[in-house]
Amino acid sequence: TCVATGTRLHLIEPLGFKINEKALKRAGMDYWDDLDVTTYIDYNDFLEKNPGAKIYMATTKAHQVYTDVKYEPDCYIMFGKESAGIPEEILVEHEEDCMRIPMIGEIRSLNLGNSVAIVLYEALRQQNFAGMNLEGHLHELHWK
């Protein structure tokens, strides 16, 4: 999703997955070389290297829905590990910046990749998909 949208991926350790050639191939990430990615040793490292960053936090614990947020062009959208989410110690300091994707019942959470795509495309929609291809083309035939 990041490669398709020209979005930089910021990874904050410890990661919930391994970044090695075998793991990337298994995940079908043959476009890894095209990915704009930055890795940080921890959350404080991220904050130090991105001073003044506007961060929205995706969490099942939030009060507001992701579509209620007005995303700025250079904001960050943080997602936690699929198994645990963003640590509550971080969430409680940013309650007004937390948002959720609505779900029914007592479902724990959506797949991390799906959640990223849902929220990222809402942020891009609010920016009128700036810089993105808005039209597709047939390869062999022509539209009538």
Q: Model segments located where?
A:
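Post-transcriptional modification and biogenesis factors for structured RNAs
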Residues: 1-144
